[in-house]
């Protein structure tokens, strides 16, 4: 679900409900403190300008899309109540630590954080299995991230072969990289 709920807690809950009805086991969101991950000077991409208020900054847009920690707690409780696992990808260390308080059985590392060593150390410190997204990463960066996670005591890592272009052109899929 990411931030496709447009900042609406009710829509996020509805997405979880529909996912459960369709047979999904897990629904994934994103957790971030916007001021820690987006510069107040960052401009929006052209596609963002076309689909949101062109006059607002990237930071203002992101603030509207992300939930508070309290809202994430409520969303997790809702997911528990309907029998679907809540998962989130934290984008900063405070979000990692917050999600650690929820007792989640799994966390997800977004592609953009694979070279963020303090972040990876915080993830490993949760002692929780992780999904590691690898979009835009070199094999050396993936190897280094795995080393940080292993050294920090992360019990299990599942590597996700990712491409950050949606939809991915067939010629860029490079599925042989998985073997």
Task: Please place each PLM-identified region on the residue numbering.
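Catalytic cores and adjacent flexible loops of soluble metabolic enzymes
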Residues: 1-179
């Amino acid at each position: 679900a990411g931030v496709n709920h447009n900042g609406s807690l009710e829509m996020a809950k509805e997405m979880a409900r529909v996912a459960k009805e369709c047979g999904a086991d897990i629904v994934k969101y994103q957790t971030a403190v916007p001021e820690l991950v987006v510069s107040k000077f960052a401009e929006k991409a052209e596609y963002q300008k076309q689909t949101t208020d062109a006059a607002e900054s990237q930071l203002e847009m992101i603030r509207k899309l992300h939930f508070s920690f309290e809202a994430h707690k409520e969303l997790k409780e809702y997911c528990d109540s309907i029998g679907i696992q809540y998962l989130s990808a934290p984008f900063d260390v405070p979000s990692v630590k917050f999600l650690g308080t929820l007792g989640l059985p799994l966390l997800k590392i977004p592609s953009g954080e694979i070279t963020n060593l303090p972040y990876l150390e915080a993830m490993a410190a949760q002692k929780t299995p992780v999904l590691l997204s690898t979009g835009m990463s070199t094999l050396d960066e993936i190897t280094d991230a795995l080393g940080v996670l292993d050294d920090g005591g992360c019990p299990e890592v599942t590597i996700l072969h990712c491409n950050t272009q949606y939809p991915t052109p067939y010629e860029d899929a490079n599925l042989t990289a998985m073997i």
